[in-house]
Amino acid sequence: MSDKNKLLLLFDRPLETVIVPRGPDQEAFDVPVDLLSDRYKAIGVQVSNRFGEETKSKIPVKKISPPPLGEILDLPRQANFSLFIPKHRKIAGRLINIFLGMKDTDDLQSMAIFARERVNPYLFNYCFSVAILHRPDTQDLDIPSFIQTFPDKYLDSQVFSRAREEATLVPEGQRVPIEIPRDYTASDLEVEHRVAYFREDLGINLHHWHWHLVYPFEGAEQVVRKDRRGELFYYMHQQVIARYNLERFCNALKRVTRFTEWKDPIPEAYFPKLDSLVASRAWPARVTDQKLSNLRRDQDQITQDVDDLYRWRDRIYEAIHSGFVQTDGGGRQELTEFGGIDILGNIVESSNLSVNRTLYGDLHNMGHVFISYIHDPDHRHLETFGVMGDSATAMRDPVFYRWHAYIDDLFQQFKGSLPRYTEEQLNYPGITVTGVSVQSQGGAANTLNTFWQQSDVDMSRGMDFQPRGSVFARFTHLNHQPFAYNITVNNASGGNKRGTCRIFLGPKTDERRTAWLFKDQRLLFIELDRFVVNLRQGENTITRNSTESSVTIPFERTFRNLDLSRPVGGEALAQFNFCGCGWPQHMLIPKGTPEGYDCQLFVMISNFDDDQVVQSTEGICNDAMSYCGIKDRLYPDKRSMGYPFDRLPRNNVNTLQEFLTPNMRVQDCVIKFTDRVVVPRPRN
């Protein structure tokens, strides 16, 4: 194939046939008639001719004999697609395997066109994205951000009628961004709406979607089996809950309440104000005090009782407390100190790496399904699932955090059964952290500054049947002044040493402004950075910028123009996709308060000899490795994820100060929020 980048044009305008010109260069695929859908087989030539003047070049498409799609076509083109629904994930696995099985990119292009013309657009986008990420001959391609293909999953439904007007009537150079209000899903009467800026943030929801793209829980072995995948499921979501709780504290709300009683009413309502442009339907809402019901959704082949969740939960608890799981072959597998959390993660989620899905079930995924169908459990009203049913939208819903607080508590039950870290396991003899401070650009020492910022996103690639050219939506999100860590370390070990610098941020007091017990506080520390340091003998000064964080992806990657910010050159481009997975840089630190929210910055230097994973990562994208790992490599830190806060403290340690060893240090700091909006520069 002369230019495999042409594959990316198949993401553009997902409802339009591929024979219509697409992309900035107005290219059209020259498709053999057999690959077209029945609707266009007879009129394909007329459609091509109609757009002939717009078409600047034709992309040749190889004629192949595609395999039958079979049950993949069971999902109607106008339906919504959910990874959490077993039937949907099964057919997704089949389509991914078909794409992975194509012998070269020419065959892949032909097969993708054949499928795209026939299958559900959401299903196609997911399966084609996973295949591109995992095929050796395509994994260097830069797949479009999901918001640019399906902006309807992220933007207020009122935007699209205004966007059509702008696209149809206004010349491209004179179009102005369509501003989305910050408070469009609820009013201040709803206390949970205080943290809507977090739940509905584009970058956070794109992170969740991209993480599940990189770590699918169904499909071929090569797609699902990744190093410490189950443990990463636990850690990434644990950090999401910790971050959410910090935002709640900044907004005078208590910690999120675990969703434990599944037959009780759910007091939190959610009205998403989203429309599906594929289904031409509004996303269903959940009103106050609805209850979960047994599911009888024949169309989705779901027959499941709420009691099944209880059965699966009890069996998982039994495994945790007995220290082993039963495999589907009838054997036992121990939940060991370092490997047990990975086994448990795959069971709880569950992925097809679960050692016994028949016994331990599908707790996390089906929890999403039960909640997402709460408004129509037996399909009597012909309604689709709510936002909890889609990894691209689930984090918008307040109940997502209640459900994941419960899931995290399961993992904490296991972590509580492990031996506590001894001082020897925490200390680094001869290494003392003597000073820590943070400095914002133009701000006071140990003060982090946050504010509102507006950014634009181009919707045109996801707007079918509209005139070409960019149409921008402008939305308001949290951001912060960049800052730097200044850390001084004394090396009295008698030789040069290497260490891993681990930086966390946590709340100084609980929601009642009382001092923490460390066993509770440790669960609210959010990871800010993790990096290797070389320590000479004597005093060392370490300076690190917040933008270098191992947790986040750069701001430009979340709000990128696909054609302007794509990296140039093989290695940079090769890793761009995996790097698309990561916490958004603009949400690295919590909002804070106008008077200043009191936090504690924790810095630790651990012994690199105990952390090191021997492997080459040269040329590899690892800028967001903490939550996402590294592509085709082992997770780059031998320690348990969340170390040193992932286990209960040793005996007689009740406070953070008592927990510290010489290679750790804590610095009090404040996060100050200023209620101002930074507006982007005019485009014209």
From Swiss-Prot:
Q: What does the Swiss-Prot or TrEMBL cofactor note state?
A: Binds 2 copper ions per subunit.
Sorted alphabetically, which Gene3D superfamilies does this protein's record hold? Di-copper center containing domain from catechol oxidase, Hemocyanin, C-terminal domain, Hemocyanin, N-terminal domain
InterPro entries, per this entry? Di-copper_centre_dom_sf, Hemocyanin/hexamerin, Hemocyanin/hexamerin_mid_dom, Hemocyanin_C, Hemocyanin_C_sf, Hemocyanin_N, Hemocyanin_N_sf, Ig_E-set
Q: State which Enzyme Commission number(s) the record gives.
A: 1.14.18.-
For this chain, the annotated S-S bridges are 579-621, 581-628
Instruction: Enumerate the Pfam families for this protein.
Output: Hemocyanin_C, Hemocyanin_M, Hemocyanin_N
Q: Which residues bind Cu cation B?
A: 364, 368, 404
One GO MF term on file is: metal ion binding
Active-site feature positions: 349
EC class name = oxidoreductase
Q: Tell me what PTMs the record reports for this protein.
A: Propeptide cleaved by PPAF1.
What domain of life is recorded for the organism?
A: Eukaryota
Q: Which tissues is it found in, per the record? A: Hemocytes.
Compartment(s) = Secreted
Instruction: List GO BP terms, alphabetically.
Output: innate immune response; melanin biosynthetic process
- Residues binding Cu cation A are 208, 212, 237
Q: Which controlled-vocabulary keywords does the entry list?
A: Copper, Disulfide bond, Glycoprotein, Immunity, Innate immunity, Melanin biosynthesis, Metal-binding, Monooxygenase, Oxidoreductase, Secreted, Zymogen
The record's Gene Ontology cellular component field reads: extracellular region
Q: Does the keyword Disulfide bond apply?
A: yes
How does the annotation summarize its subunit structure? Dimer. Might form a homodimer or a heterodimer with PPO1. Might interact with PPAF2 (via CLIP domain); the interaction might be required for PPO1 activity.
- Which family, according to UniProt? Belongs to the tyrosinase family.
Q: What does this protein do?
A: This is a copper-containing oxidase that functions in the formation of pigments such as melanins and other polyphenolic compounds. Catalyzes the oxidation of o-diphenols (N-acetyldopamine, 4-methylcatechol and dopamine). Cannot oxidize monophenols and p-phenols (L-tyrosine, tyramine, gentisic acid and hydroquinone). Binds to the surface of hemocytes and is involved in hemocyte melanization. Activation of the enzyme in response to bacterial lipopolysaccharides (LPS) suggests it may play a role in innate immunity.
Protein name as annotated: Phenoloxidase 1
- Species of the source: Holotrichia diomphalia
Q: What broad taxonomic lineage does this protein's source fall under?
A: Eukaryota, Metazoa, Ecdysozoa, Arthropoda, Hexapoda
